[in-house]
């Protein structure tokens, strides 16, 4: 049985078009750290997000450059 502690996160993208709430996910501490490390290169390319309601959104680089990325950790 997997005894690795997991917690819930949610990726949120804020820009001139609104607030986009990513689908919540259960991750390990290691996965969370990997997400944070990947977010450091967020502004260098486009971004894809599956939203809470199941909608899949693709943001082009010019929109990403004017956006704020939040990784919310829920305890």
Which positions does each model-derived feature cover?
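A generic structural signal for short, solvent-exposed coil/turn residues
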Residues: 1-3, 39-41, 51, 61
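Surface-exposed beta-strand edges and their flanking turn/coil or helix-capping segments
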Residues: 22-26, 35-38, 62-64, 71-74
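N-terminal acidic leader/helix
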Residues: 2-36
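Intrinsic-disorder/low-complexity regions
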Residues: 1-2, 14, 64, 73
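Short, mixed-charge low-complexity intrinsically disordered segments
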Residues: 45-75
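A short, charged, amphipathic alpha-helix used as a generic interaction element across diverse proteins
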Residues: 31-48
